[in-house]
Amino acid sequence: MKQYLDLMTRVLAEGTPKADRTGTGTLSIFGHQMRFNLQDGFPLVTTKRCHIRSIIHELLWFLNGDTNIKYLHENGVTIWDEWADENGDLGPVYGKQWRAWGTADGRQIDQLKTVLEQLKSDPDSRRIIVSAWNVGELDKMALAPCHAFFQFYVADGKLSCQLYQRSCDVFLGLPFNIASYALLVHMMAQQCDLEVGDFVWTGGDTHLYSNHMEQTKLQLSREPRSLPKLVIKRKPASLFDYKFDDFEIVDYDPHPGIKAPVAI
């Protein structure tokens, strides 16, 4: 994961001080890309420990179309707590947009089922895309989508994915985002009888919060370790039938965790 540390170094060296919605302040760059060959290992940051349980359960929650934090709480995941209302609701965030995008004529589009069908029937299509950026519902969301738009690409029997992330918290959020989408690519590839290819991450406003600087420097002082491997223990009937226990991350040997405040 040297690419991730290189991004941190770039933000520290080139970042512009900016105000932000949370009032915390950031160092920010605009436009950055990283490419991870998923054949080389699972791209989970090793210079600090990442909470794998949260990454997996959050993705399963998205895939279920859920937008209430009850499932997350039942599974010991608290990463969405700061944005939920008193009933645990978040409004029409990722799960709603991925699984039930509302149309003007009252229909709902399951974008994930659609892309699965496309990958199987027309893998050369240039329209295999999922968007969470529903302009008509942004004002109803507790938090506008940060990882907003992703596209799949098939070549030589391998499935690749590119994500556009409009806003990126490099220290806290990005390790989760990379691992989450890498996991999704593995799941989609298994369902479509493909090998995994590349995960390409593209960032818009890519920033370090001002209260993450010491943590960032600590992380940069650490040497990256070998990437772990992802094992998927079974092939469920569909993308939506995976369970937490279907996944195992093996040979993950990270440095200790580093705590940092969340900007809300």
From Swiss-Prot:
Keyword set includes Repressor: no
GO annotation, cellular component aspect: cytosol
Enzyme class label: transferase
GO molecular function: thymidylate synthase activity
Localization in the cell: Cytoplasm
EC number(s) per entry: 2.1.1.45
Active-site feature positions: C146 (nucleophile)
Subunit structure, as described in the record: Homodimer.
Family, per entry: Belongs to the thymidylate synthase family. Bacterial-type ThyA subfamily.
Name assigned to this protein: Thymidylate synthase
Species, as recorded: Photorhabdus laumondii subsp. laumondii (strain DSM 15139 / CIP 105565 / TT01) (Photorhabdus luminescens subsp. laumondii)
